[in-house]
Amino acid sequence: MSNPRRLARRARMLRWLLNLYPPYLGAGIRIQHIGADMRTARVRMKLARWNRNYVGTQFGGSLYSMVDPFYMLLLMEQLGRDYIVWDKAASIDFIAPGKGPVYAEFHVDDALLDEIRQQTANGKKYLPRLQVDIRDGAGELVARVDKTLYVRLKPQARQA
């Protein structure tokens, strides 16, 4: 893991780059916050003409897109270069129509990092399942996304 200043700079740069990413710009997705310690993120998507579906609510593909990379990115930063981290699978459960701006918050804590390190210490893959809720401005649940990640300690980092 990087030193705190370097990590904070990386967080600011990542937020800036993602906010300029054309698919996010086009969908009205904004990264509002990435924690200086790269353990948290908050993403917002407004409802606009170009991201509405046929019935005038948030397009489901955009709802998924707004949450797609964040657990992978946060874990990559926390675990460091000795680990392989990939998105493996995802599912989204649409609970209620998104009729306005929606938000998602991501949190990576010590317990998750410790579990991943313990499960991968022997060089085997680990498939943590993480969940993120997408909520509207009133805090009502709009969708729930389940993500499965693939995490493995790189061969050169394994103990003999």
Residue ranges of model-derived segments:
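HotDog/MaoC-like acyl-thioester-processing domains
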Residues: 3-8, 98-99, 109-160
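Hydrophobic beta-strand-centered segment that forms part of the acyl-chain substrate-binding groove
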Residues: 74-111
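Short, charged/polar surface micro-motifs in flexible loops or helix N-caps
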Residues: 37, 48-51, 69-71, 110-112
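Non-catalytic linker/capping segments at the edges of enzyme domains
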Residues: 1-42, 160
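Short structured motifs
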Residues: 26-31, 88-94, 115-117
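Hot-dog-fold acyl-thioester-processing enzymes
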Residues: 50-70
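A generic structural signal for short beta-strands and their flanking turns/coil linkers
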Residues: 27, 39-41, 86-90, 100-104, ...
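Residues located in well-ordered beta-strands
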Residues: 30, 91-93, 105-107, 133, ...
